[in-house]
Amino acid sequence: MSTILESLPTGQKVGIAFSGGLDTSAALHWMKLKGAVPYAYTANLGQPDEDDYDAIPKRAIEYGAAGARLIDCRAQLVAEGIAALQSGAFHITTAGVTYFNTTPIGRAVTGTMLVAAMKEDGVNIWGDGSTYKGNDIERFYRYGLLVNPDLKIYKPWLDQTFIDELGGRAEMSEFMNQAGFAYKMSAEKAYSTDSNLLGATHEAKDLESLESGIKIVNPIMGVAFWRDDVKIAAEEVTVRFEAGQPVALNGVEFNDQVELLLEANRIGGRHGLGMSDQIENRIIEAKSRGIYEAPGLALLYIAYERLVTGIHNEDTIEQYRENGRRLGRLLYQGRWFDPQAIMLRETAQRWVARAITGEVKIELRRGNDYSILSTKSPNLTYQPERLSMEKVASTFSPRDRIGQLTMRNLDITDTRDKLRVYSQVGLLTPGEASALPQIKGDGDK
């Protein structure tokens, strides 16, 4: 039996993820007029562009909701964000600049916590504002059904009747005004923005063109660092971790992780840290483009990665990075709570993050321009005396190194023999500018 309802289930409770914006406001009132019993659920994700959460459920009641609840998701959001940080669950990068998967993390939290609240109220039909071309429709589908196996999905934007009657923002605005709500449609921006406490996503409209760049974006979590008239002074900041958890910024300890991340956002935001422009593959494999902000996570990530490289050995770091990229894809696909994701995440948290204790001092300048000034940790395996060029007591002698190099003759001989074979069969034809050894066949020795 299909879990997708293509028409409005009249006479039944329908939960809607309610942002208070034009789309969900019009959808809620339309459902009420058409005979459904709408319930509104609003997630407080610490969105930097929302200044009055308490007013949102009140508006939902005015528009016809039989019930409206505000769900505080901030603590869970930050907990999942730090888990992603600890496991390096970030697979989208361009030239070393990272997208921190802030929207996928937000969807994992929203999709589970709102549906859990609906289930408490006996609401087993859920709608939201995601479109059929995007990632969120699948993310919410997966997370919702994980929490409530009896859940049915109704999305007004998949209902042809709704589309025919209220297919655009102008029609929605007129509909709300005619209903007596004096709803003023906000001014159209050149792009769409979605945000939470971890970061902001700017995409669509003018940003669909790769001829448009970051300069058309007005940041909501930091400064437009590319503008000459924006003055940004260099700033030194210290970040301290204990057993993989960020605990202090500039010597100030935080018992509340939400407050710590808010302060990290303020510090990083003063410099435009963590902004990136990415081309990515959506879940359906079509490419999309987004410009992202994540000043706080970026700041914490710099310090965390510095400690990872100073504490763990090469093979552990390599496995951490490989697993992190795989986990990032699973997170992006809406599989953050799938068994394979839990396995990868908990492996990193147990065997990588638990050893990360220390403090890193960073100088922030403009955008992603920074320098690491100092690194301290009781767990460092970096010991400069082991490789010092000065005359110090050493853990190995020149004769030890001669023996080690002599043992390398075995694999060097194997490599030389393989290169000769490749040359004989025509796979290697070194040119004049090639750095390949001039390996010849047996007859040319």
Swiss-Prot record:
GO cellular component: cytoplasm
Residues annotated for L-citrulline binding in this entry: Y99, N135, R139, S192, T201, E203, E280
Gene3D superfamilies, alphabetized: 1.10.287.400, Argininosuccinate synthetase, chain A, domain 2, HUPs
EC category name: ligase
GO molecular function, one term: argininosuccinate synthase activity
Binding-site positions, L-aspartate: T131, N135, D136
Protein's name in the database: Argininosuccinate synthase
Gene name of the record: argG
